[in-house]
Amino acid sequence: MKRAMGFLLSSVMLLGVLSGCGGQNSSSASPAASGSQAEGQSGEQVTLTYWQHSSAARDEMMTKLVAQFEAENPDIKVNCEFVPEADYTQKLIPSLATDTAPDVFQVQSGMVSKLAEAGSIQPLDETVMSTEMIEEEFVAAATDGLKYEDKYYGMPTDMQTILCFWNKDLAAEAGLDAEKGPQTWDEFFDWARAMTKRDASGALTQAGWGTSGYWPEVVSYIEQMGGSFYDESTNQFVFADDEKSVAAMEQWISLYRDDKVYDTQFSKTWAGFRQGLIGMMLGHPAMLGNLPTTAPDLNFGVSLIPANGDSRASCVSSWGYVMSAKAPSEAATRFIEFLSSEDVEKQWTLQTGELPARKALLDDADIKADPKASVALASLDDAFVGHLQTAALETAWSESYEKLMYTDEDVKTVLQECQANLNQELSNGL
């Protein structure tokens, strides 16, 4: 289901090194991690614990925001813990069955329904953030995945869509329009072939497109080709039974299998793009802020995802701020409300390059000042929510896609196995 959305990016980095949230060391659990202080009589301070998957920019930004929140809300103290992303889910899920669960935390949006069904999280406090207000002020595609049985259980963060990036110098060398970029999928695939180079022995020396099956890219292509990836009426993956989806996947993987525009042994995808070894990438708008910092000499262009006819459908992936079942509802929702406020969303967007979800920010002059940011905003005019948004689903997809890359197994057969594994995972509990 497509929804208009909002987004942007910036390469502005947060200045200075800030102390840990709420006076706690950000690399270790706070003393309050074993349970929050309950909301008590007037004048009592409530202590919340907050967890998020760690990255330097996000951690520093959250530290700053928590200090701002505590100054504005002296009756609430927030202790933070920043967990390495590789360990985050393994640490979080077991904690939800114990007193060690955080009060407020980030979770992939695909986990919300499972956590809500299990009773591990609670709906947002309607007295603080009403359903009417959320649906009036936020873009639907940003919040749809955070709703369960007509109640909102969280607010969005870390939202991304898919854009097209290309190396202008490599494109020009290949005789391509380096300023315009590929506008259709036929052009995109032709560009990938044109920018692929091999030496006399046949060894790859330049890859045309760093394609490795990242699911939002693939699902965007399937959607544009008229395929059905997921049936919302049955809550089941259906791509292996859909002729258009299978045909789209056969075309997609043929660029790797047959045209050999990339080889995973040649270079990692984004590392190779930064080094000038890969001609094109599909990826998140956050790379618009990342690339000038990590590859300052890279001459790159960016455009909307290639089109099929009038469709530039782009898949949205996101996380959400939610609160555990044990959290003090009013205080925890106030913290989530703060993190979702217009001012904070704008700060977060400019500092981290992630998508704003508030409608009011879609035409923000500061965000749109960067021409590349305007492209990112436009990409969300034809956006839809993806359904592979849990770690387990992503792993099952990646394992199947590796078979497509590294073996000559029949595409439909691999997709049928993948679909069965994904649907089985949907039926699994936490």
Give, region by region, the residue ranges found by the protein language model.
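Hinge/lid segment of periplasmic solute-binding proteins
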Residues: 40, 108-163, 189, 222, ...
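Extracytoplasmic/periplasmic substrate-recognition and gating elements
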Residues: 67, 71-72, 77, 172-174, ...
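Extracytoplasmic "Venus flytrap"/periplasmic binding protein-like
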Residues: 68-138, 147, 173-175, 183, ...
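Periplasmic solute-binding protein
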Residues: 112-120, 141-180, 210-234, 315-323, ...
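Short, solvent-exposed loop/beta-turn-alpha elements that line the ligand-binding surface or hinge
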Residues: 122-138, 180-183, 199-208, 227-247, ...
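Long, aromatic- and glycine/proline-rich binding clefts that accommodate carbohydrate-like moieties
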Residues: 145, 303, 349-403, 428
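Conserved C-terminal helix/tail region of periplasmic/extracytoplasmic solute-binding proteins
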Residues: 172, 178, 254, 379-430
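Glycine-centered hinge/linker elements that transmit conformational signals in sensory
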Residues: 189-196, 234-263
